Amino acid sequence: KRIKDIRWYEDKVKAKPRGNAYVIGNGPSRKGFDLKKLEATGQTYGCNALYRDFMPDFIFSVDTKMSMQMVEDEVGLKTAHYGPALEVNRKQSKGMIHLIPHNPHWISGNAAFWTAGVHGHQNIYLLGFDFREYGKGELNNIYQGTDCYGERDDDKIFEGWLKQFRDMLKMRPYVNYTVVHDNPPEYLNHLQTGTDLGNSRVVSYAEFEKVLAPS
């Protein structure tokens, strides 16, 4: 039996956009970059275990195990923690998780850049977004093998993340999305599908540094 939850949830975060939106994924391509550099010129959005090393302005989780670990660590008392209704409504959540606005039911990292757009940001930068897994034995996530993540032990390649991003480009043609990557794989050169809306690009970290410290 399928159940549809149609309850109304008050927006207790009441976020207002400030500067750029910096959305931090946990892909290996951002390893070594100092995330504290982002704080002066915008708002930071992140997901899952990022809080262990850096506390963004907004953080997202959709997995129960990860969400409950974040509640135990009281992440929601330190920043705005977003999740789906299933996690918001758990008694164990202790009111620390806010509902993802107009939830598209995407993975946590993609829910982060979705919400940056809902908050009104029109210039969104994505760091650590590699948009796919690389197979057994490969590093796919900075936190791979740690609590709530486990090992990468199969050869399955999942590309749904990239499709969700391409869908986002079509849904919000008035928002500019910039992927920051020093060694972009070929598929990052083909972010647009169908008509090129001109609202996506890929830049290196050296180019991105100029955004953070404009002359």
Annotate each PLM feature.
Residues 1-215:
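Metal-ion/cofactor- or nucleotide/acyl-coenzyme-handling active-site neighborhoods
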